[in-house]
Amino acid sequence: MSVTWEAPGGWEDLGWEPLAPGVGRLRLPVWDCTVGLVAGAEGALLVDAGSSVAEGTRIRQEAEELLRAGHPAPGPEGTGRGSGRRVTHVALTHPHFDHVLGACVFAGAEVFAAVGAGAPLTSEDGRDALRADAVANGLTAGAADGALELLTAPGHEVHDDHVLDLGGGVRPLLANVGPGHTAYDLAVLVPGPRPVVFCGDLVEESGAPQAGPDAVPSRWAAALTRLLELGGEDAVYVPGHGAVVDAAFVRRQREELSRRFGTAW
């Protein structure tokens, strides 16, 4: 199969939704969770990683099939186009099971999360909470335990903003925009003629945003203001769950959150 990043059909043939040249996303079954892919000439960024070892493995296989098709020229692993054919970086938007438990299968990739996100992924209390949430939402205990056994802390914590250089002028920005949905919310901006913003669960389209016990409601609306500042009026905003939206949708959700929690933005 011949795939070019400029041709949306290549993404769709592999089950992914094209968002911009070199940028796409996959909506996963069961929880309708989004994972994103940003392809550069020398590397690729995955945004979130699925809910289990099995789901992470599927994501990795599909993403790397797409990357190989988009970078058909051979190259040594770790250099030039060779590293552009595999996932070299993973950004975790927040430490909830449906977004992080698949990260353990991306050996060799650099993993990024908001500062402090390592604690709920590696501490005993954090792992117990992750497991309980996963099982309560339908993941089998065995699948949860298998992923948690392999899960490690992110290698890089983002304090403010951090730019990745994926080669070929592809430079996504990782932005610590929270707290809001959790205490550790990371967004990803992919600049371009029409920017793409991966919002994590700060924005949800398929239902009202979910505020669990680890949410920070007093800061959530302000986090959406930061997302709007990142992307601007013309960006494509990618929720953690549901269809892609525009800036007007994000503003409406910000207003709803402000009313719901009695906070300003």
Description of each model-found segment:
Residues 22, 38, 48, 63, ...:
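Divalent metal-coordination and catalytic microenvironments
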Residues 13-64, 186-200:
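Conserved beta-strand hairpin/beta-sheet module of binuclear metal-dependent hydrolase folds
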Residues 44-45, 51-53, 69, 119-176, 225-228, ...:
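Metallo-beta-lactamase
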Residues 246-265:
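Binuclear metal-ion centers of metallo-dependent hydrolases, dominated by the metallo-beta-lactamase
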Residues 53-113, 157, 229-236:
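Active-site metal-binding motif and surrounding structural segment of the metallo-beta-lactamase
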Residues 2-18, 169-171:
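N-terminal amphipathic/basic leader segments beginning at the initiator methionine
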